[in-house]
């Protein structure tokens, strides 16, 4: 048996922060679920490799597994590519969040689960931290705090080289102490389906309870995490952890850093809109070692947490608020993160979709924009939209076809402009305090005639039954400029048995379409198809077609012969 491993050192303290190989390291983190979009819940090595590479290219240097231990394929990819990992054991402890959830077996199984996670992670240098759970209200009670300390000690007995944290939702803990938002069973639990038509529970609890009230309260819950009750909740659980993980409680950072100089903190779950405030505190306080935004990559479930339009009539399918959508496309919010982190040096320019001009979206709390970096909206001339510029500059000037639309001060790394669509060039010019140009970016309208553009990420696969070919499918003009208003059916035909279609879909949040059919509508001009190698040598020809465009064909070869 051959086992790969890595060697590196970890140190952590309130005075030094987190040190990796003796160097202070700030975690530019994102939370990810285990699913792989159009592939569903399956973990393929090629899918994890692609996902981690895209995340790394966008500036992330750390991932939090939400909310279960990572697959070996994902950890292998993180080891190779260089991505830190906070591996998380549980989404809940012994208090149910749903009727038929793991809480029913937690007390009998948690030690074996922790042991399995640590033994799986031990030789993976990418894993730098363990998390015991997510938004578990047990941490508000004495029994839960004692259990947390016991689990921490269990992990330390298996691996004393990595710190232990837990994602504490302070506001949920405050409510739990008041008996609010906690799941309760009035009858004995039965391991059988409830009668047809009967709900498992009538009231939201746990994370679902928090998500509901986060939408209602908005910025108010930021304030509620900084009360005396909240202070007590954090104070009591802190000794049971090496690093205190705080979910949506950045209002505590300044006071806790001053009052508890030896207490390490990490933003285990935050909103992207809050990053200017949060990252400023990460840079200011040694004890605050990083920030993990929700979520780095979009996922199936917890539907419609972003911006959605009523004109899409399908069933809710995706969360719809990820910094990167399920096809692997980085969105405007991702550019905002790069700007705040300082990894993006030029201003970023995006506009809200003109094919929905006049519609009012339902705005989820976890997404602050649905803008995209395109100025190609044929058929929507004269329609109003909002242009958004993300930058570290003092102010921004917006120009359309060399005419000044306006100049605005930058607030929280953003400047917004009202503008009406006209084909041509939309430009954002970043200015310093003396109004000297420090950078610029522009969006140029594409031509009207659509073509299908198909981009396979590889043309040769090994015959292992696991290798994947990812194919981006877009409606563009002849120069490759995306036509984001093109939302129509695309069909896929495969000739030859070398590969099969493993998944095909778009990033549309609400849809009645599924990922297993050889046809799907594009969303924002785009879809993703994934082909899986068989176990025998051969070649397949794939043809992609759509109405009013020329079909496009390409080949995928499956062979055991290595490419030269």
Question: Can you annotate each of these PLM segments?
Answer:
Residues 1-150, 160, 164-165, 240:
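Active-site-adjacent substrate/metal-binding segments within catalytic domains
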Residues 128-130, 153-157, 164-466, 478-482:
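Substrate-binding clefts and catalytic carboxylate motifs of secreted carbohydrate-active enzymes
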Residues 397-399, 489-493:
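Beta-strand signatures of extracellular beta-sandwich domains
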Residues 11, 451-453, 493-510, 562-564:
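Short aromatic-acidic-glycine turn motif
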Residues 416-421, 517-535:
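Short, hydrophobic beta-strand segments
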Residues 465-471, 538:
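Short, solvent-exposed loop/turn segments enriched in Ser/Thr/Gly
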Residues 2-5, 435-447, 550-559:
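Edge beta-strands of extracellular beta-sandwich domains
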């Amino acid at each position: 048996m051959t086992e790969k491993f890595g060697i590196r050192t970890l140190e952590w303290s309130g005075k030094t922060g987190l040190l990796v190989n003796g160097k202070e390291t700030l975690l530019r983190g994102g939370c990810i679920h285990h699913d792989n979009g159009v592939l569903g819940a399956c973990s393929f090595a090629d899918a994890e490799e692609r996902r981690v590479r895209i995340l790394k290219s966008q500036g992330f240097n750390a991932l939090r597994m939400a909310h279960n231990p990572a697959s070996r394929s994902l950890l292998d990819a993180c080891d190779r590519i260089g991505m830190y990992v906070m591996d998380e054991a549980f989404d809940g402890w012994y208090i149910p969040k749903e009727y038929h959830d793991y809480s029913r077996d937690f007390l009998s199984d948690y030690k074996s689960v922790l042991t399995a996670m640590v033994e799986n992670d031990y030789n993976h240098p990418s894993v730098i931290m363990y998390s015991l759970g997510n938004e578990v209200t047990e941490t508000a009670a004495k029994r839960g705090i004692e259990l947390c300390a016991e689990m921490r000690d269990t992990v330390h007995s298996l691996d004393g080289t990595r710190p232990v944290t837990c994602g504490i939702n302070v506001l949920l803990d405050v409510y739990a102490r008041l008996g609010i938002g906690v799941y309760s069973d009035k009858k004995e639990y039965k391991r059988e389906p409830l009668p047809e038509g009967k709900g498992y529970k009538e009231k939201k609890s746990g994370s679902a309870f928090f998500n509901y009230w986060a939408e209602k309260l908005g910025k108010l819950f930021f304030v509620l995490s900084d009360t005396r009750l909240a202070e007590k909740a954090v104070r009591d659980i802190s000794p049971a952890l090496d690093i205190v993980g705080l979910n949506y409680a950045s209002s505590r950072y300044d006071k806790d850093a001053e009052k508890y100089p030896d207490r390490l903190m990490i933003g285990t779950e935050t909103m992207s809109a809050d990053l200017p405030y949060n990252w400023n505190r990460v840079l200011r306080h040694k004890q605050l070692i990083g920030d993990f935004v929700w979520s780095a990559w979009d996922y199936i479930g917890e539907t419609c947490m972003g911006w959605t339009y009523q004109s899409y009539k399908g069933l809710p399918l995706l969360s719809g608020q990820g910094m990167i959508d399920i096809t692997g496309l980085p969105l405007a919010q991702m550019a905002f993160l790069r700007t705040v982190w300082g990894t993006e040096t030029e201003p970023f320019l995006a506009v809200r979709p003109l094919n929905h001009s006049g519609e009012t979206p339902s705005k989820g709390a976890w997404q602050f924009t649905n803008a995209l970096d395109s100025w190609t909206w044929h058929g929507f001339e004269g329609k109003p939209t909002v242009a958004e510029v993300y930058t570290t500059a003092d102010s921004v000037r917006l120009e359309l076809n060399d005419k000044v639309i306006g100049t605005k001060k930058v607030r929280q790394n953003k400047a917004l402009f009202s503008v009406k669509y006209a084909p041509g060039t939309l430009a954002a010019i970043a200015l310093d305090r003396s109004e000297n140009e420090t950078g610029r970016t522009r969006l140029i309208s594409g031509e009207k005639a659509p073509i299908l553009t198909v981009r396979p990420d590889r043309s040769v696969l090994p015959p292992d039954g696991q290798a994947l070919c990812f194919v981006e499918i877009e409606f563009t003009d002849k120069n490759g400029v995306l036509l984001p208003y093109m939302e129509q059916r695309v069909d896929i035909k495969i000739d030859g048995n070398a590969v099969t279609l493993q998944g095909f879909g778009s990033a549309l949040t609400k849809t009645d379409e599924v990922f297993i059919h050889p046809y799907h509508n594009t969303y924002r001009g785009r879809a993703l198809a994934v082909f899986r190698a068989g176990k025998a040598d051969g070649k397949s020809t794939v043809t992609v077609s759509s109405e009013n465009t020329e079909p496009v064909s390409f080949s995928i070869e499956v062979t055991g012969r290595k490419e030269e």
